[in-house]
Amino acid sequence: MSCRELIILGCSSQQPTRMRNQGAYLFRWNNEGLLFDPGEGTQRQFIFANIAPTVVSRIFISHFHGDHCLGLGSMLMRLNLDKVTHPIHCYYPASGKKYFDRLRYGTIYHETIHVVEHPVDKEGIVEDFGNFRIEARKLDHLVDTLGWRITEPDTIKFIPEKIKAAGLRGPIMQDLLRDDHVTVNGNTIYLKDVSYVRKGDSIAVIADTLPCQSVVDLAKDARIMLCESTYLEEHLHLAKSHYHMTAKQAATQALAAGAQQLVLTHFSARYLNSKEFELEAGKIFPNVAAAEEFRSYPFPKNPSSK
């Protein structure tokens, strides 16, 4: 089974601190590396995390404020230096195309990697292929900002005792998957009677925003909701004026969405102890963690989920 985890490469907001780098988040999932909002210094954070940057296959930029994208150029150059042969898919708000180009071509280097751009100009499904369905929604921030929902496909799981009782084995199993029914010893066996559908897991990544319906829609039943919480409730006035959320607001949104786990991030440099965010949110949403750099948050596949 491929690893399924979120790795925090940085969790500070606008400026880094001695303890926190600007944000960057890596999901390793279904043999892909999904990198979200690589801030300044992301390339170096991979070294500290002991992860090869070559695992990255897709890069998502929520918006073009510097702390969410300044690491893009250096990451593309590093992947170029490492001579990766797989395509690097990049997703970003279409209105920020000129900023993407400036980051990508901001220095002199000979680009040999295959970068596939996906400028997003409308909400909904951006891409749907074998590994994932990628959805985007507009968030409520000062500039065009996208939140993301990534969902793996549903899979059919056989129920062993029912398969055995029906006398099914060997190549006929593939016939059953293809045709939805087979005949064995004069009996018609239907796929639905010997199997169940395991719903694919989803994750949600919520960057800078005020509380809004898009957050709830993106995070509905998500295994992990990675969500900004720039401020504590005592600074609610700052959250409102800068179009950010508090830990309490993030927890309220997670509860409304029915998310399974909430990971808070994007902490203002004014706070030295990020555990305060966990405590504030935990009063509303119990399964919450304040992001810690280089920590892994696994979400193993539950084979019995239906």
UniProtKB/Swiss-Prot annotation:
The active site is at D67. Pfam families: Lactamase_B. Keywords: Endonuclease, Hydrolase, Metal-binding, Nuclease, tRNA processing, Zinc. Its cofactor is Zn(2+). Zinc phosphodiesterase, which displays some tRNA 3'-processing endonuclease activity. Probably involved in tRNA maturation, by removing a 3'-trailer from precursor tRNA. Homodimer. Belongs to the RNase Z family. One of its GO terms (molecular function) is 3'-tRNA processing endoribonuclease activity. Zn(2+) 2 binds at D67, H68, D208, H266. Its EC number is 3.1.26.11. Zn(2+) 1 binds at H63, H65, H141, D208. This is Ribonuclease Z. It catalyses: Endonucleolytic cleavage of RNA, removing extra 3' nucleotides from tRNA precursor, generating 3' termini of tRNAs. A 3'-hydroxy group is left at the tRNA terminus and a 5'-phosphoryl group is left at the trailer molecule.
